[in-house]
Amino acid sequence: MTSVNEHSLLINNNENNDNNNNHINQRNNKNNINNRNNIGVNNNNNNNNNNNNNNINNNNNNNNNNNNNNNNNNNSNTGKIYLRKKKKWNFRKKILPMIVILIITAIVVCLVVFSLPFDSSNTIYNQSPFVIKEDDNLLELAMKSRQNLLNIHGNQTISKLDFAILVSNPIGYWQLATFNGKNNSNPQQTLFLPLLAAAVNWCMNQNNDPHCLQTAAGPMMNDMSSIHAGILMDIITDAPNQEFQTSNSTGFQSWLTKRESIELFLNSFNLLGNQTIINKFYPSNSGPTATWGEGLIQKLMGDNQMCPYDSALLMLNLVKSGILSEGQSYMTDLISRQTFSTFTSIGFGLPPGTTLHSVLGTSSSTKDLNEIAHLVLPNGGEMIFSIFSNGYENFGHAPYQSSILGNFAGDLIRSLGIDIGCPNKIVMTSQDKNCTVTGAPWTLDTSIQAYNNSFLYISGGVTPTSTVTWSFTINVTGLYEVCVWFPNGDLHTSVSYKVEPGDGMIYYFPVDQVHYGARWIRLDSFFIVAGNQPIISLSNRGIDPSKTVVADSVKLTRWPSSKGIPGFSNDFVIAESPE
């Protein structure tokens, strides 16, 4: 676990530079650059030495002239001896001022040194424009939320959850908590975030608008297209795949240097760390797998590698204009996401009306589930999550294959109290007095996956047909999001939730209760007038006798409202980005 430092800290330029230089200097083609730099340094040192020698010779000549003058004076004053009177040190005029100056200097030095943030290794951190402080309480609560998720879903669903979390503090800094924050993993499609930043940087260096590569960048981010990601990499590196046979082939080293331009760009802002960002994401525009030069790179450098900590810093710099400020609006537009969508995982734990910027990376074969996300809650609370996990669940029923991290995010937000001031929510369990059963009785059972550790169930085919009904009373008119919660179960089946908002309309929503339990499943959002009593119900009608129906909890959450517009949040209006 990452040690937490009581001192405030800024991002470690010195440590990052060492790590970044070690990473970049692994490339053989950098040796020539280093040699040229060394030659330049040696030339400068030689020039300085020559200048110093000249100065010494001049001083010696001056001393000789002074000695000659003194000898002449002595000769002209032959026979006369003058005794020089020894001066006394005056304490008030000489010694006391020197002591005062020394004391003032010592005080200034101490103030400067102790005002600098240090890490546990006494390394000074300094990266403008963000002040970041490791926070004990944030780490403790994040670890509890992490453990809760692992306990509920077990090792079969998820066993890895590395994270870096940043929370905006109202007094002007970011709180930080990390767990395995520097551990590298295959980023999958989260690679597209640094690739997008490099594309905007390329456009600006060409004196073009930041969105000059939108034709490729748009499909890459909107459709997660690896083909367009490959096209984009070829353009900004000016190094499309070539038919090199070995790393000693003519031209390979110069081609490799071009391919490293994305890493060099990140390194220039101290955002690379020990990450490897040089390979395409396959299948790509150059083939289904890495071949020729791209194959050689993959053998030499290994797979792409990213970590939660440096990924979180990249997202922070992009959305808060730490770098590429002219392209900030364009980039945030491209990565704006809806909660409960295929483009996010933590979004399944966020209240409606949340502003979400996110890049998601998944793999069916390795179960990788990675997300780099920035969010602003309806109350203005702001956070950055960078999570690398193995919680991808390939059971179909989009968008819930990637939904598991929503529990972690939602639990942590509630624990921190960051959601205080957001629109109200109502959670009703099967044990609430306003949850009623009509027909045959349901059986009460317990499970760690149940919302409040208890739930009701009934088999299909039981007569008479039985229904569980959750009845709500609405006191504030508005747009309400309706979600349901239930535990997993192999004997469960697909059911149909019935929603009656109170306006005379009836809606049915099929939900698979076999998979994707122990999380909030959104049915839809409904406009409900104050005084109405919306009803959500679940029945065993038409269910196979060998299967069971589970009734657990229902949640209604009101969307934010502004200027009389239901669902409108002030954060929906994008402020002018800084120049």
Curated annotation (Swiss-Prot):
Residue segments, region Required for targeting to the plasma membrane: 1-75
UniProt membrane topology term: Single-pass type III membrane protein
Keywords: Endosome, Golgi apparatus, Membrane, Signal-anchor, Transmembrane, Transmembrane helix, Vacuole
Topological domains annotated Cytoplasmic: 116-578
Compartments in which it is found: Contractile vacuole membrane; Endosome membrane; Golgi apparatus membrane
One cellular component term from this protein's GO annotations in UniProt: endoplasmic reticulum membrane
Note: The protein is normally retrieved from exocytic vesicles before exocytosis occurs. GFP-tagging of golvesin at its C-terminus traps it within the Golgi apparatus, making this a useful marker for this compartment.
Protein known as: Golvesin
Lineage: Eukaryota, Amoebozoa, Evosea, Eumycetozoa, Dictyostelia
